[in-house]
């Protein structure tokens, strides 16, 4: 019983170590290669065991020194289920291995190519599929339209006719949609009919204007002619009156002296009367000339008056400009005074906060500073003093201490303000020079 159990156990162990190869899987390469190597080891083990068996006793087991596995080797009469790997079987396996090696380089690229082709077919973008379907539908619709045209027309249409038909259809579609057609070239060309009509209209308008002016001109011309004739008639009438007066005077003289003895007296009288008439004519002419000269002088005076008026207007405008300039100067001085007032207020706060002057003179200085600020606020300070203070402030902002010191030295001589106010200003500016500016430069 123990021997039978041992035999069964050995068979099961060997079956697990060397499972039998099924008939269908003999063609696969990796399993055949995996099975080929262990039999070789087994054969070598069996050969070693066969050589070692005669040295031991017949009933004893294999020696433990040469055991290569945990399980004991197969007994002498054990026959496995699969065909024993013999020496004659090894060349077949070797030949089959050679065949597989020969077939591998030819078979593998084909399989790879097939797999690549399959992968391309399997993985497709859905967008491409939709595009292909749309293209197929378009092609089918075009084929249907072509077939319908061939059935309807019966005769083939040339390309030129097709192009013209397409243009007509496009024009019809545009008109139906309400789209404006392109501007024709004729609209930009010269149009003789319209221009002739316009020319006729302009000519008619000119003729009408000419008629109107001709109708209006006679009245004006008539008035001017009447004026000229009146002036000429007045001159002629004055000359005729003079001649008639002369003749009447001569007749009176002849009637008064009919005696021959008085002919000489008549001659003398005529001569005297002629002299008198000449003198009268001269006086009249002088009076008329005086009137004319007076009228001319009046006209000249009227012409010269604009110059006087222009001079008067220039004087007025000069006065206005002077007033404007004075107003501008006042505004500038007020702005300067306002900026100086703010500057002095801030300086006063810093000066008395630091406690630079703790003597009894500090109270008087504070009172003088208040008076100075009141004058600046009320704009009662002279513009010259304001300009000097503004100049000193600009020098302080520029940090030009040398020029500022020189200006402070010259300030009491050139300013017109009281000495107390001048002391306040010199104290404030010197405070800036000695205390504030050095701190800023050190920072």
Curated annotation (Swiss-Prot):
The modification Phosphothreonine is found at residue 277. The modification Phosphoserine is found at residues 238, 254. Residues 15-333 are annotated as: Disordered. Residues 109-124, 159-176 have a biased composition (Basic residues). The modification N6-acetyllysine is found at residue 12. InterPro entries: ERICH1 (IPR026719). Residues 42-54, 281-296 have a biased composition (Basic and acidic residues). Keywords: Acetylation, Phosphoprotein. Residues 205-226, 250-266, 297-332 have a biased composition (Acidic residues). Residues 87-97 have a biased composition (Polar residues). The keyword Acetylation applies. This is Glutamate-rich protein 1.
